[in-house]
Amino acid sequence: MSARIIDGKTIAQTIRSEVAEKVKQRIKIGKRAPGLAVILVGDNPASQIYVASKRKACDEVGFISRSYDLPDTTSEADLLNLIDTLNEDNTIDGILVQLPLPAGIDNVKVLERIHPDKDVDGFHPYNIGRLCQRAPKLRPCTPRGIVTLLERCNIPMNGLNAVIIGASNIVGRPMSLELLLAGCTTTVTHRFTKDLRFHVEHADLVVVAVGKPNFIPGEWIKPGAIVIDVGINRLENGKVVGDVDFAQASQRAGWISPVPGGVGPMTVATLIQNTLQACEEYHDPDIGNN
């Protein structure tokens, strides 16, 4: 059996096109374009690439994108002051602080300083709490993007035995909340989990986000299972691979997301969706600020 490929690149482009059309309609009736502020502290090469892709996506859909490239000597106080200024800026609907931040800056304090209605990454405790209470507002980008992938492929999630490998704040933990909301029976595994293979072999849906190349052998995958590979790992030969042995897993799975071209493009597309949502639901003049 050969798995069907979950084409995140194509689905993400469709979402971008949908958002671009909505922006055109907003402008046509006299409303402003959504605004996104992207803050990069330091010169981490990987972060620079991620930020560039987000800015490009903003331009593509017609958003107003504002860039703040700060030196790695920036103090925590200066960064917090910038966020305060952007929180008060009525032309900015979303504030994104690219992680990781340099040593000496408290990630939690910075993320909590962003107003929840401008938290388009979905990391603020308020937004995570809303998701936990089954009343989501702005949702974490990668987990929401994964759910969108499954929905756009018409893959029903209700009743699935789902296993998440990795318990990070960015993917694993919010992913568990998204899958609970979708009706899955959800297990989160982590570095203390015993007999990981057992959990994977019994999973109808596997979401892997550990950042280790080919960490999950393809032979562990249950025949017909859905495999979502969040990992992006560059090997010494320059090849980019995921956390799952794709060659083997694709011969057993029913559906599988490739790396690259699977989850990655959806994270950026969801950021764009969240920014439009923040603009339309929380910041339009006829709505008023919360």
From Swiss-Prot:
Any Pfam family matching the protein: THF_DHG_CYH_C
GO biological process assignments: L-histidine biosynthetic process; methionine biosynthetic process; purine nucleotide biosynthetic process; tetrahydrofolate interconversion
Keywords associated with the record: Amino-acid biosynthesis, Histidine biosynthesis, Hydrolase, Methionine biosynthesis, Multifunctional enzyme, NADP, One-carbon metabolism, Oxidoreductase, Purine biosynthesis
Pathway: One-carbon metabolism; tetrahydrofolate interconversion
Gene3D superfamilies to which the protein is assigned, alphabetical: Leucine Dehydrogenase, chain A, domain 1 (3.40.50.10860), NAD(P)-binding Rossmann-like Domain (3.40.50.720)
Signal peptide: none
Residues annotated as binding NADP(+): G166, A167, S168, I232
Keyword Electron transport: no
A single MF term (Gene Ontology): methenyltetrahydrofolate cyclohydrolase activity
The protein's Enzyme Commission number: 1.5.1.5, 3.5.4.9
Catalytic activity: (6R)-5,10-methylene-5,6,7,8-tetrahydrofolate + NADP(+) = (6R)-5,10-methenyltetrahydrofolate + NADPH; (6R)-5,10-methenyltetrahydrofolate + H2O = (6R)-10-formyltetrahydrofolate + H(+)
Gene Ontology cellular component terms for the protein in this record: cytosol
HAMAP family the UniProt entry points to: THF_DHG_CYH (MF_01576)
PANTHER family reported for this sequence: C-1-TETRAHYDROFOLATE SYNTHASE, CYTOPLASMIC, C-1-TETRAHYDROFOLATE SYNTHASE, CYTOPLASMIC-RELATED
Subunit structure: Homodimer.
Function: Catalyzes the oxidation of 5,10-methylenetetrahydrofolate to 5,10-methenyltetrahydrofolate and then the hydrolysis of 5,10-methenyltetrahydrofolate to 10-formyltetrahydrofolate.
Protein family membership: Belongs to the tetrahydrofolate dehydrogenase/cyclohydrolase family.
Protein name: Bifunctional protein FolD
Organism expressing this protein natively: Proteus mirabilis (strain HI4320)
